[in-house]
Amino acid sequence: GDITTGKNRLIFEVAVRFVNNFLAQEKELLTDTNNQLKILATEETLATELRIEGIDYPVKIHGQVDRVDELNGVLRIIDYKTGMVSSSDLRVAAFERLREKEQYKAIQVLLYAYLYTKSKKYHFKQPLQAGIYSFKNLQSGFLPVDFSSNYRNPAVEITSEKLEKFIFEKKKILKEI
């Protein structure tokens, strides 16, 4: 529709403000000469196949990751959200709980991390994180998945073991379907 008037104009103005605020935050990050940021991919489609015991054919999974970057040697898989996201939305204290509806944001970015590691044959030679930039919570910056039950002592690095536990739980769900 026409973005010069009415509701469409308001939505457009909000989107412009979100983008400008985000870019200002990125610029601020880069004013510190110690920070090294490389954007490796945007809007990248990733795919792989899962072999599940008891299912006679491979299950294809895919997703489109908003951004892959490297910040100070840490590879980050990033999803942008226009809505409100807080760090508690990305806390994964137990992989078995990843069936719960409120865990969908963590599930999404962990799935992107899994897809990235499989489709790019990633060997975990550098730290890996997955998380969200929430445009309604930009002051919190990049919100990574946190595997710690103690918010004061975060555990945000994704290892191959953590991804295997994650995908094991997803395979259990697929077997039930």
Task: For the regions a language model picked out, list residue spans one by one.
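Structural signature of nuclease core domains in nucleic-acid processing machines
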Residues: G1-I177
